[in-house]
Amino acid sequence: MAAFLSAGLGILAPSETYPLPTTSSGWEPRLGSPFPSGPCTSSTGAQAVAEPTGQGPKNPRVSRVTVQLEMKPLWEEFNQLGTEMIVTKAGRRMFPPFQVKILGMDSLADYALLMDFIPLDDKRYRYAFHSSAWLVAGKADPATPGRVHFHPDSPAKGAQWMRQIVSFDKLKLTNNLLDDNGHIILNSMHRYQPRFHVVFVDPRKDSERYAQENFKSFIFTETQFTAVTAYQNHRITQLKIASNPFAKGFRESDLDSWPVAPRPLLSVPARSHSSLSPCVLKGATDREKDPNKASASTSKTPAWLHHQLLPPPEVLLAPATYRPVTYQSLYSGAPSHLGIPRTRPAPYPLPNIRADRDQGGLPLPAGLGLLSPTVVCLGPGQDSQ
């Protein structure tokens, strides 16, 4: 497959604050905003295009592309409260998921779609429960390794992208700096802005020369959020439960009326943050009745899960710091200045695993602006050469 990412796309490091498009003074506090200050979080319309200065003219195959954010009213509702997104060591999917409708592509041309996340500012935040507001807690933590998430169907014809809603529901957020599954790495209690990029796969052999004109970036200010390890604003929790179709079990019961966990569960190690489920109760009972059976199940379940969840060997490991980097190293035969392997990690899709409740197992959930990521996460069906 012809190389489709050109050199020279990496100029603005993701660790830098991105100049967001605004309709007024962008650094004035918005009335009713849960944040003390920061970029204006109001949307500029059904679509928002952000192209840093100095890009020059664009290829007609991307200049006419327009993007519409799906579930815009829901995003705006979350934004009014101050959207929060959970980050975990294993990686957590976003809700609402980032979904867009694309128009204006060349039906016969190939395009790659990708996303990255940039800090909104250089601050770290904390949530004040007494005032239900976010407060600045200090200077931002050291920047996390910058990564780009490719849509798993990339590259594909424009006709395919425009035929249906494009969803990045496989994208996961993590706070694990050593993540080797290709997830987006973020700092907890920091604010981020997702960016969406459309890249034209230029078939010309010298496509590196046209790198600056072969992509177009889009930004929707209503999708910005604060990364958290647990929801801080109870209204965000309620809205997530009310609007997430996978939270049916929470809606059908009163959270305040849940029974207190039995005493044996208090011995569960504190390092385990997984929600306790009925299968844990069953497993605990089995261990009390038959210790031999319990030891057998605990010896089988981890090995079974390890076999199913073993990440592919070609997954990339992010470097320790951000550095502006070009995509020239992704081309076949081009020198690799950072030593980035040209193999693709495939963090998705993981197999749909159901734990054997008789074994006491835990059920698993169903679950470029001028761009300079330091690690590229390719999806299935992609070849970097």
Swiss-Prot record:
Signal peptide: none annotated. Residues 69-252 bind DNA. InterPro entries: p53-like_TF_DNA-bd_sf, T-box_DNA-bd, T-box_sf, TF_T-box, TF_T-box_CS. GO terms for molecular function: DNA-binding transcription factor activity, RNA polymerase II-specific; RNA polymerase II cis-regulatory region sequence-specific DNA binding. Residues 22-61 are annotated as: Disordered. The keyword Nucleus applies. Gene3D superfamilies: Transcription factor, T-box. GO terms for cellular component: chromatin; nucleus. Keywords: DNA-binding, Nucleus, Transcription, Transcription regulation. It is found in: Nucleus. SMART domains: TBOX. It comes from the Eukaryota. One of its GO terms (biological process) is regulation of transcription by RNA polymerase II. Probable transcriptional regulator involved in developmental processes. This is T-box transcription factor TBX10. It comes from Homo sapiens. The lineage of its organism: Eukaryota, Metazoa, Chordata, Craniata, Vertebrata.
